[in-house]
């Protein structure tokens, strides 16, 4: 009996969560999967894929939501999207497909599946991101070492980092002077919301600094469906999504961004500079 059949037989008698979370021999096949990253966090997955991945890079990791549920993190053009993978105890569910074994699940990815979400963004899963990457063992020598502050304690040493929280997709935007509606490609990264003429445009039309935004909310004043607005001191931007689900996703992540910005401001963590630039 081959290794795959042996482990497949074990899969039918093991608790579903054990197959994915245990570190002993019962989860050998999963641990041998080079692009399974275990308990890698959502933030770390986004940082890895954005900094060192490319369009179509992906990795599998444990979900922090519930046992038996896992996340496939996928690098799109300027964002990272996350999709659920579920092990039911008898099969693996991903997207519209269900796989009776881990072998079939992995084989599906070997054939570079095409997937799309509510935003309409299509992605080909081409590049599994490895858990282990070779790096040179080179270290720098410390030549200068002094303290820039005095009298501080461990209570003053608070680790901080901005969330990446990326999203991208087409939205229809109302013009500022001429109130016509045009479809633009939007990208959200850190505290910047950029919009471009289309997905292939190298330079944004405008960068909106979300630290200046006071509110994000559904809007019913424009006689359009799936519309929401971003309120800035200098202007209110009206945007429309193709579906209600997509509009809700944008509102949720933008509101979450604003809550994180306010939290940082209230805690006095760093200086956030204003960067609302108009290029054309």
Curated annotation (Swiss-Prot):
May act as a B-cell-associated adapter that regulates B-cell antigen receptor (BCR)-signaling downstream of PI3K. Residues 164-259 form the PH domain. InterPro entries: DAPP1_SH2, PH-like_dom_sf, PH_domain, PI-Interact_SigTrans_Reg, SH2, SH2_dom_sf. Residues 35-129 form the SH2 domain. It is a peripheral membrane protein. Changing residue 173 to L: No interaction with 3-phosphoinositides. GO terms for molecular function: phosphatidylinositol-3,4,5-trisphosphate binding; phosphatidylinositol-3,4-bisphosphate binding; phospholipid binding. Phosphorylated on tyrosine residues. The gene is DAPP1. The modification Phosphoserine is found at residue 141. Keywords: Cytoplasm, Membrane, Phosphoprotein, SH2 domain. One of its GO terms (cellular component) is cytosol. Residues 1-20 are annotated as: Disordered. One of its GO terms (biological process) is signal transduction. Induction: Upon B-cell activation. The keyword Cytoplasm applies. Interacts with PtdIns(3,4,5)P3 and PLCG2. In vitro, interacts with PtdIns(3,4)P2. Highly expressed in placenta and lung, followed by brain, heart, kidney, liver, pancreas and skeletal muscle. Expressed by B-lymphocytes, but not T-lymphocytes or nonhematopoietic cells. It is found in: Cytoplasm; Membrane. Changing residue 197 to E: No membrane association. This is Dual adapter for phosphotyrosine and 3-phosphotyrosine and 3-phosphoinositide. PANTHER family: DUAL ADAPTER FOR PHOSPHOTYROSINE AND 3-PHOSPHOTYROSINE AND 3-PHOSPHOINOSITIDE (PTHR14336:SF15), TANDEM PH DOMAIN CONTAINING PROTEIN (PTHR14336). The modification Phosphotyrosine is found at residue 139. SUPFAM superfamilies: PH domain-like, SH2 domain.
């Amino acid at each position: 009996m081959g290794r795959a059949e042996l482990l497949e037989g074990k899969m039918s008698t093991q608790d579903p969560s054990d197959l994915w979370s245990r570190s002993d021999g019962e989860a050998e096949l999963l641990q041998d999967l080079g692009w399974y990253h275990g308990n890698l966090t959502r933030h770390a997955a986004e940082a890895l894929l954005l900094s060192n991945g490319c369009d179509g890079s992906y990795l599998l990791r444990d979900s922090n939501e519930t046992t038996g549920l896992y996340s496939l993190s996928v690098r799109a053009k300027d964002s990272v999207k996350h999709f659920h993978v579920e092990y039911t105890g008898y099969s693996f569910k991903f997207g519209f497909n269900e796989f009776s074994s881990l072998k079939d699940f992995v084989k599906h990815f070997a054939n570079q599946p095409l997937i799309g979400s509510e935003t309409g963004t299509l992605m080909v899963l081409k590049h599994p991101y490895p858990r282990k990457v070779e790096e040179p063992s080179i270290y720098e020598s410390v030549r200068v070492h002094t303290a820039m502050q005095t009298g501080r304690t461990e209570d003053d040493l608070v680790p901080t980092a901005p969330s990446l929280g990326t999203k991208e997709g087409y939205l229809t935007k109302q013009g500022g002077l001429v109130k016509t509606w045009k479809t633009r490609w939007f990208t959200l990264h850190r505290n910047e919301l950029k919009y471009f003429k289309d997905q292939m445009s190298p330079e944004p039309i405008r960068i909106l600094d979300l630290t200046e935004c006071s509110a994000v909310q559904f809007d019913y004043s424009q006689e359009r469906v799936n519309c929401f607005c971003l309120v800035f001191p200098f202007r209110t931007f009206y945007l429309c999504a193709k579906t209600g689900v997509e509009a809700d996703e944008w509102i949720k992540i933008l509101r979450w961004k604003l809550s994180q910005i306010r939290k940082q401001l209230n805690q006095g963590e760093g200086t956030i500079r204003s960067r609302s630039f108009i290029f054309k």
